[in-house]
């Protein structure tokens, strides 16, 4: 068995005292000082993340827009240069293979960013799907390190390091720039529910970019942040995680994300027919939020019960919420039990713990 890969920032993480975990073949920082402190820093100031384990695939050529229109559920042709789109790649039955962000870097050039655990699958699927078009596929994951600065102080931290006027960088914009003298692809995207930026830079430049951000952020309360708090941040924001809320057995419509499926775009795309059928028929189960005032948190895989104790769903993600002060969870439940305010229970190791259905997201930042 091969050893996990290390990011270009590994020595920095070690010096910061990080606790590591192996994830998707990478040795990644799980936490530095503590989950709650890192989580709260992102909500109130800013956190600095190493996300180099994500996968990047470049699609380019005269028919790159048409190729991605066919390969993904998005209308890639409609993405303007310098903007990004949240989308999904589905199988022929409409099941989700991964959720993605697609950046349009030029008229004939896109960068597709895949989740680490699915990067190889996404790259292989894209290679096969774009082969029928006048477009090329290149897995460029090794060309990039990915650093994210997330939180309400992100603009204050990044602004002194770039000549780009950050007030002009809209949410879900992404284009080439410079940060701390390094060439980057600067994107106003993230997975925390806060404002922030993701910086795609070369592995060689990554340590200097990280250190420049850390130095600039020192006066603003910036903390290095690990994958553990990233999970509680995205949970509070109601953002899905592949393998939990999303899978090849579920369509985007199951996860309340039917809006990303562009059935009206020109031409065919992989999964179009079953997705069109799914759009016309409500799913049997719906993704909902759950909250409880009890001490123990519902966790992935726990059974959801109705008031009489009958099983009516399953928890997909759950944790104590540092921001809200009580446990929260997302779960798939039968539609007739999905209305906010519905009283349900979760079987937590043999104990039926009362929970209430609530609307998603649990947390929404102030604009």
Curated annotation (Swiss-Prot):
The gene is gcvT. The lineage of its organism: Bacteria, Bacillati, Actinomycetota, Actinomycetes, Pseudonocardiales. One of its GO terms (molecular function) is aminomethyltransferase activity. One of its GO terms (cellular component) is cytosol. Pfam families: GCV_T (PF01571), GCV_T_C (PF08669). One of its GO terms (biological process) is glycine decarboxylation via glycine cleavage system. The glycine cleavage system catalyzes the degradation of glycine. This is Aminomethyltransferase. It is an enzyme of class 2 (transferase). Its EC number is 2.1.2.10. HAMAP family: GcvT (MF_00259). The glycine cleavage system is composed of four proteins: P, T, L and H. It catalyses: N(6)-[(R)-S(8)-aminomethyldihydrolipoyl]-L-lysyl-[protein] + (6S)-5,6,7,8-tetrahydrofolate = N(6)-[(R)-dihydrolipoyl]-L-lysyl-[protein] + (6R)-5,10-methylene-5,6,7,8-tetrahydrofolate + NH4(+). Coiled coil: none annotated. NCBIfam families: gcvT, PRK00389.1. Belongs to the GcvT family. Keywords: Aminotransferase, Transferase.
